[in-house]
């Protein structure tokens, strides 16, 4: 978060009946935890007199020798980025997006904005590319084709093949900007079965809630209901409620608007355990 480099805060977490946690320093906030996989929280920052909210997402620290082969594959992702100085000064709005991110076993990467790498690896829309550098402890530096440092990637991966990608984008205006990107492997969205359940979420707008799914049907905590279309606009994505979602076997829930007019936020959540 802007201006918070190296800052630390401490407190305690109280577990709620719905499986979420409340931090002692923010009684109206929720912390979402997938044990040994992922932690999702949110924080409010006052910048130039304007309240701004950001998500805080982390994966377990590992001392294992994580290699490119461990994280290789194609990921579906959602992201939120500040592309201008005005955005970082709270006089402009961030931009959310969705797309695909491919990593090879040699550490090269290709990103396709609002398009599917698998369908067109060499000329997908919004194509960008570069390389990853090993930093150790499950972290990787992301560099552009011109060797510009774009940020840091962290990965959860398990022996069973589950993966979660978390990318912290640094201050690099004119390309990816400052922000965040989250992804899960591109696999078929088999609605129902293990994907059924309740997912708690936090947003970059400063609110939280939950959505329950059963097959192709969903119900938000506020009472809104609807249906989902699996593998739309491509494999692993889900068309629902005016946006695109991902509900992964890893227990992760992600959502962002598919309308460019409303692409100023994203939602990250986890399945109730």
What does each model-identified segment do?
Residues 1-273:
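Mature soluble binding/inhibitory domains
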